[in-house]
Design a protein with these regions (language model features):
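SDR active-site strand-loop-helix element
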Residues: 1, 26, 69-70, 102-107, ...
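Residues forming the Rossmann-fold NAD(P)(H) cofactor-binding site
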Residues: 8-9, 84, 123
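Conserved glycine-rich Rossmann-like NAD(P)H-binding loop of the short-chain dehydrogenase/reductase
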Residues: 20-28
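NAD(P)H-binding glycine-rich loop region in Rossmannoid oxidoreductase-like domains
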Residues: 31-35, 39-97, 107-114
Length: 293
């Protein structure tokens, strides 16, 4: 579910190209999905809104495993309530169809911290989905590095447009971004990884670094050296103004919601990925983030 989004479209193409699975892509606008025609016999496109219980139930009929990639931050209304309602509707449809396994991509963040509304919603969605299916694998990730990722594109646009980066003092908070290809590999392996109970699996790239360092690292990869100035306080309205000026409007709207999460460390704190995805974990250890750009 959510096949027309950034991760959804990449995952769909990845599955078709690297596996022999039959894929059913469910989203509001299947006409937006781009794929190689040679895989058309293994791909079924279904138009369904996540709030349409009957349509989702039909889309889940005969499915062995589903991937849930929905977020509502770009929609009108309170996204926390919308995401909860969407998860409830999908969960009920999954239970009705007898779905045995569900994969969900959520966000990192310690449940014991005072989390942003964005991260609270991500975690709440996982709790709701878990209550409806026999087995939920909830991945928690920070920024996914790849063209089309909203967080990544916002950072890229700011670096390209602003020679001086004014960032708040809490930009020293650490994050652990993961490359798109690695996130896709985790999602793909999770479809068949042997598990008997639900798990929260935190995933990240090989390095922890601050948001300030992330900006500097990306800038260096494109031959730039911006002046990065830490300031004690950057009001949310000022950050929103910058986003509106230098990023696409839809990205800016979502970015304003995500910006609140920058005060929360988004790093891997458990080692479940080592237990269930050992080969992928060891592969990641050999990488450096500079290769991700």
């Amino acid at each position: 579910m959510g096949a027309s989004g950034f991760v959804g479209q990449h995952l769909l193409r990845y599955l078709l190209a690297t596996t022999n699975y039959s894929v059913r892509a469910v989203c509001r606008r299947p006409e937006d999905i781009q794929y190689d025609a040679q895989y058309a016999d293994r791909l079924q496109l279904i138009s369904a809104d996540v709030f349409d219980y009957d349509a989702i139930s039909k889309g889940l009929e005969g499915v062995d495993v589903a991937v849930y990639l929905i977020h509502m931050m770009a929609d009108k209304g309170d996204y926390y309530d919308l995401e909860a309602k969407a998860a409830e509707t999908f969960g009920k449809a999954a239970r009705r169809s007898g779905l045995p396994r569900l994969i969900y991509m959520g966000g990192l963040g310690n449940d014991n911290d005072k989390l942003s509304r964005h991260l609270l919603s991500r975690h709440n969605t996982g709790k709701i989905l878990k209550s409806y299916v026999p087995l939920l694998i909830e991945f928690r990730a920070s920024m996914i590095v790849g063209a089309g990722s909203i967080a990544y594109d916002i950072m890229k646009n700011l670096v390209h447009n602003l020679p001086v980066q004014t960032v708040p003092s809490w930009a020293v908070t650490h994050t652990q971004p993961i490359a798109l290809q690695d996130a896709l590999a985790y999602l793909t392996e999770s479809l068949t990884v042997p598990l008997e109970h639900s798990e929260i699996v935190e995933i990240g790239g090989p390095e922890e670094l601050s948001y300030k360092d992330l900006i500097v690292r990306y800038a260096a990869s494109i031959g730039r050296k911006p002046l990065v100035v830490l300031v004690p306080i950057v009001p949310l309205w000022l950050g929103a103004w910058w986003l509106n000026l230098f990023t696409p409007r839809r990205h800016a709207k979502v970015g304003r919601q995500m910006a609140e999460s920058l005060v929360n460390p988004m790093v891997v704190t458990n080692d479940r990925e080592k237990s269930y995805f050992r080969i992928l974990f060891l592969r990641l250890l050999k990488k450096r983030l500079v290769m991700y750009w």
